[in-house]
């Protein structure tokens, strides 16, 4: 870095390069289904849609953190970084995104800068295999026979221990109690769902 007024001619702006790199990262994301306001919980409920997960794109990309050691607007930043979160529904898509992001290290637009990519995919997706479908069918049959209920099969973009176990064994997830406002300080559960869901899980086993 250097002084913006006196050293622009021999300094390279790392944040400027990072802006280009972030733009390229977001180009890898699957297109969204439409205007965000049409897919809030309230909007979907008004349309009678139960499975909100069906609208989650094949992959989602989020540059959630950016930064630099520079804290003065009169100084050309010599470093900058970002942290990226990627979610995919298939291992093939995950591998493709990983490869394309790493290739961005060679995509330097601002002369005098360089791009370094560190890290990688940490946890795999929980793919729906034929074995998983068989387990889903068994669980649905148990709920119908024992409680006369119907199971809404959801797709979700979150991350749980199920993502880790799915790498080794067929896995069903989210069979616990109904909850609301997850990851907030006012998260709550519906206790009326505790007994039937626990019983259905035990019978399935």
Model feature map: region roles:
Residues 1-205:
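Metal-dependent amide/peptide-bond hydrolase catalytic core
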């Amino acid at each position: 870095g250097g002084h913006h007024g006196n050293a622009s001619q021999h300094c390279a702006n790392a944040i400027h390069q990072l802006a280009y790199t972030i733009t390229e990262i977001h180009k890898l994301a699957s297109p969204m289904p439409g205007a965000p306001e049409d897919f809030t919980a309230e909007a979907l409920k008004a349309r009678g849609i139960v499975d909100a997960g069906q609208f989650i794109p094949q992959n989602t990309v989020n540059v959630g953190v950016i930064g630099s050691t520079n804290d003065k607007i009169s100084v050309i930043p010599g470093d900058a970084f970002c942290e990226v979160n990627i979610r995919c529904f298939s291992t093939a898509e995950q591998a493709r995104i990983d490869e394309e992001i790493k290739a961005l290290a060679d995509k330097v637009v601002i002369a005098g800068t360089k791009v370094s990519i560190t890290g990688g995919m940490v946890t795999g997706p929980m793919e729906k295999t034929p074995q998983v479908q068989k387990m889903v069918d068994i669980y649905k049959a148990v709920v119908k026979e024992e409680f006369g209920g119907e199971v809404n099969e959801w797709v979700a973009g979150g991350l749980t221990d199920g993502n880790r176990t799915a790498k080794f064994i067929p896995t069903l997830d989210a069979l616990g109690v109904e909850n609301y406002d997850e990851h907030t300080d006012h998260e709550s559960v519906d206790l009326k769902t505790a007994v039937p869901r626990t019983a259905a899980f035990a019978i399935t086993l």
